[in-house]
Structure formats: C-alpha cells, structure tokens
Amino acid sequence: MEEKTEVQAEIVQKKEMATVSQITDSGNVMLSEIYIENAAKQIEFRARLIQTALKALKPHDIQDFDGKPYIEGEGAARIMSVIRGFKVGEAKFVIETIHPHYFVETSIPMEFMGATTVALGDCSTADPFFCGKDGKSGQYKKHLDRTGSEAMSARLILGDAKKKARENAISRGVTELLGLKGLSWTILAD
C-alpha cells in the first residue's frame, strides 16, 4: 500500500511539472518570427526616441561628473517637454540637520510607457553654491542680505536645497526610464 502511494505522488508531481506554463505566441511556438520582428522594431523605436530626446538638450544641460555625462534638471525638463508621457509622482523628502547645514534626500515615483522607477535625489547646503567656500557667502549670504534674518535665510536655503534635490531626482528618473544611464561622451558626440 505504501509503494502505491509513493508511485501516485510521483505521477502527480510529474503532471505538475509538465503543466508549467511556457512563453508562447498564439500558435504555441516559443520564439516566433513575429516575436523577433517586434523586438527588433522596439529596439529601433527606442533608438529613435533616445536620439530625439538628446536633440532637445542644449550644451549646458549636460555636465561632466567624474568623466561621465550627467543630464542636469533643466535638460530633463527639456526632454520631458519633447517626449510626452512621463508621469511624476509626489516627492517625499527626508531632511537631516547637522548644524549649520541641511541634508535633503527625496524619492519620487516616476513612470514612462509602463516602466516605473522610484527616482532618488539629494542635496546638501554644505555645497559651496549655498554657503560659499568660506561658509558665509553664496546663496545664504544673498538671502541674509535680502531678509536681514538668519532664520529666514536658513529657511530659504532649505527650500533651495529641496528644489535641487527634486531636480536631481527627476533628472535621474528621466535618464533611467529612457535608458540613458551609462552614456559616454563618444555616444553623445555621435
């Protein structure tokens, strides 16, 4: 009796393995000519889309970041204005204060043609743009001269840092969703 149960269990297990679904077209063919042709068309369309996106950029939209091209926030905005269909969700911010600076991180859900990502961006007010090389100039000094209040200047600097972190996140999201990650200067020159 025990032998019969083992044989039945083995037969059931073999039937389950045989019914594992396979990727097929309507004719139950694993890889069809139509499937391959459609994949080739997608590659061609994506290449044309990327070329169109890159044509929208101005020279100052691309910065050299450790020897690699980096699309700035303005460049990402230009791409989004030409290539429609990007969906940008609500930014969530995490702010860390290490006196006298703010460190801002943001995450933004993004979508383009069915592909999704959570784009990450960050910014620090310790950057010389915000506080100058001496720690008391840059944007902070401009806000302080204009408002006369250190508290108000700090609040305005935090707003600037949040804006920059959001721009960085959107730039990274556009780059990732379009497949522009890992671009080289030689590819851009072509």
Regions found by a protein language model. Name each.
Residues E2-D190:
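Polyanion-binding surfaces on beta-sheet-dominated domains and ring/shell assemblies
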